[in-house]
């Protein structure tokens, strides 16, 4: 995707197939065709894992950092992990116990345990994707973490050492306070579902590289960060601007285009759903009917699109 003088390069890290999210709306045939690259015929949903690379001025900026090296873990289902193959019921029982202990609704418990049965996860591609883009990890000057969930910060370290040794790691203060403090949340869910270590443990080797921000700011010429909380306390988006053109990388403020089209539909993963809905509403109002191209680290192929409006309804068009 070219925005004025800047090129945004998609950096793939993996793909995650899960059961369809609860509340997925019925789509007419025309709309279903538009969203068919991630809402699959068998009723499952496909989500990409990845990041975006932008060269600007003297900086090489990576927006998000994927789930991480595959050696750190794997998904359940068809992952091939011996423990998951031998004892899937044990993993499901742990997930059920974890969610019930947190007071989760039974429908949420059922969905997550079903996801463990049918999900398919492949990851660990980011290093090769950077190579294909002609960039070495030590050439990255800035890594912007849209938030500190493990599928967005996963490559910050590998085997206890920094993967981007010369980069500033941009994280919002509110997320650092939430995920990296002594009172950090229990990340059992992610470990069971994705097979990865906690955010806190993976950020520990790069503590001295973290660049905290608490007000909307500029990372590099043409790249600005905006706080849009709800999914996590410090959830944010990145805005790339050049020659009066704009694109937005939405992190997990939006997981899939259907969340933009249908204001009543939301992927069930926001820490503060009410605040997340407000952020989504603000975003829709800003981009609807404009030439602003948007993507997220989970859109199919990390492709961009626009939110349009016609005949009294919103619809999605791929760029």
Residue locations for each model-derived region?
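Active-site metal-binding loops of divalent metal-dependent hydrolases
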Residues: 13-14, 65-68, 148, 174-175, ...
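Active-site glycine- and acidic-residue-rich loops that bind
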Residues: 149-153, 224-237
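Short, conserved loop/helix-junction motifs that constitute active-site signature segments
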Residues: 160-166
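Metallo-beta-lactamase
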Residues: 1-135, 139-151, 166-227, 244-251, 275-291
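Hydrophobic/aromatic beta-strand patches that form the interior of the parallel beta-sheet core
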Residues: 9, 144, 170, 211-213, ...
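Cap/insert and terminal regions of metallo-dependent hydrolase folds
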Residues: 83, 93, 101, 109, ...
